[in-house]
């Protein structure tokens, strides 16, 4: 990465900077903190797909760069891609944020990591900028909350959210004698469908559920939390107790979720273990297994179609006819009957950015109604701007948008407090242990409890 040094902080109030920047783009040369660095060059870091043929983010940012440079003569935008699987991306990003020599002006932050980076002092609070930005009122409150620190300040502008459910191959299901309008009521229904695929459709992976430490947060959120949050009635968080502000040790629901994962791999209903523990398994699910009819069921996210749209490199215009969608059921079919997890990403400004004010102007360009809608559709994302969500042009833009948007009613958000990344890693280790058979469910749960105490500094409770 090219180094970015910060320039000395000025004594002018941030709110004054916002007013100046909004009023006159040409004054942006004077806007920005830090020491050194080129005040006319904005460095924007982003997560680049590990699949060379998928250029969704690259194409979108290139268009925003063009718009921004045209509106701000003399300013240049340098796009700084980080090409890595999720777990490696987070590590590389944090390394960049530690020094003014390497910190970009704008970074793409997963909401699960943002509180950890806030606590580490890596990010700049955006409240002075947001106070002068009328469009901020258009964002839904839950999306805003995902980018808030424990200090009550906001550190990121969300660019969409997501939900999760079950994708299934209608062709594989037909061969397995399963219905095209499949909607499982319980976890056992999901496993039974996978068993039918295994028995009747040889050569096809019956079910993919992400697992293990190499896969990173996808294992925790797409699989484990989709299971864990379906073990109760949805009224309380099974991972974190908000009243006591303590993390919850492995209880029955936790063990049941591990048992589901163990069952998938013990009965060989999932991919080969070596494939399941490949950091790039998600790329294979989207780019190979589903399009080629080699996978029966995928527990995955709303964003998958971004890899199949025109210009994506893996064009698959028939996907909406060849794939079915079903909500993930609760464990025993108990109310509310369905479960989803939501996360999303935000644009954040590093504390050591050279040009923070210029960076926020770039965020405002990205988040106009038109540009935000363009991104939601291209990225197969769920809108976080109320005006876009209410626009028929958005809901009709792509098959599946309405289905996944409706799951917001049943969705949950991770307790993304500073300890969460370490808690998530402990979950992944427990999953990996039962996937490989290195530990029983009971052993993995005990090891998790020990790791949880370390991750949470002893702030744990049992329920």
Language model: regions and residue ranges:
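Conserved N-terminal structural module of periplasmic/extracytoplasmic solute-binding proteins
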Residues: 2-9, 17-119, 133, 358, ...
């Amino acid at each position: 990465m090219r180094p970015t040094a910060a320039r000395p902080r000025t004594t002018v109030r941030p709110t004054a900077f916002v007013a100046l920047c909004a009023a006159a783009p040409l004054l942006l040369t004077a806007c920005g903190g830090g020491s050194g660095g080129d005040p006319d060059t904005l460095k924007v870091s982003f997560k680049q797909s590990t699949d060379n043929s998928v250029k969704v983010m690259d194409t979108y940012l290139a268009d925003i760069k063009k718009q921004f440079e045209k509106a701000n003569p003399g300013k240049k935008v340098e796009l700084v891609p980080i090409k890595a699987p999720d777990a490696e991306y987070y590590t590389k990003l944090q390394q960049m944020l530690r020094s003014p020599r390497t910190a970009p002006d704008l970074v793409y932050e997963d909401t699960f990591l943002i509180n950890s980076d806030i606590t580490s002092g890596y990010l700049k609070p955006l409240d002075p900028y947001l106070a002068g930005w009328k469009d901020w009122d258009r964002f839904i409150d839950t999306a805003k909350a995902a980018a808030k620190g424990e200090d009550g300040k906001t550190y990121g502008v969300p660019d969409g959210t997501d939900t999760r459910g079950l994708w299934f191959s209608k062709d594989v299901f037909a061969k397995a004698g399963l219905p095209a309008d499949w909607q499982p009521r319980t976890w056992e229904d999901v496993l039974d469908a996978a068993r039918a695929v295994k028995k009747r459709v040889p050569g096809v992976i019956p079910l993919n559920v992400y697992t293990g430490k190499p896969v990173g947060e996808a294992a925790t959120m797409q699989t484990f939390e989709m299971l864990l949050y379906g073990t109760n009635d949805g009224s309380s968080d099974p991972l974190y107790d908000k009243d006591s502000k303590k993390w919850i040790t492995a209880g029955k629901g936790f063990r049941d979720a591990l048992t589901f994962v163990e069952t998938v791999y013990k009965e060989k209903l999932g991919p080969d273990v070596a494939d399941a523990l490949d950091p790039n398994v998600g790329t294979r699910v989207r780019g190979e297994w589903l399009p080629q009819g080699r996978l029966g069921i995928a527990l995955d996210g709303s964003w998958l179609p971004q890899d199949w749209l025109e210009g994506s490199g893996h064009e698959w215009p028939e996907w909406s006819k060849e794939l079915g969608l079903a909500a993930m059921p609760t464990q025993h079919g108990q109310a509310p009957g369905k479960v989803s997890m939501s996360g999303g990403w935000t644009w954040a400004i590093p504390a050591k950015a050279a040009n923070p004010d210029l960076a926020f102007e770039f965020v405002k360009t990205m988040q106009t109604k038109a540009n935000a809608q363009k991104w939601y559709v291209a990225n197969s994302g769920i809108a976080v701007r109320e005006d876009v969500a209410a626009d028929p042009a958005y809901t009709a833009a792509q098959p599946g948008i309405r289905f996944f948007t409706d799951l917001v009613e049943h969705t949950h958000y991770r307790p993304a407090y500073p300890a969460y990344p370490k808690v998530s890693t402990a979950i992944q280790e427990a999953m990996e242990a039962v996937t490989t058979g290195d530990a029983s469910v009971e052993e993995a749960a005990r090891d998790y409890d020990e790791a949880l105490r370390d991750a949470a500094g002893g702030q744990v409770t049992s329920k």
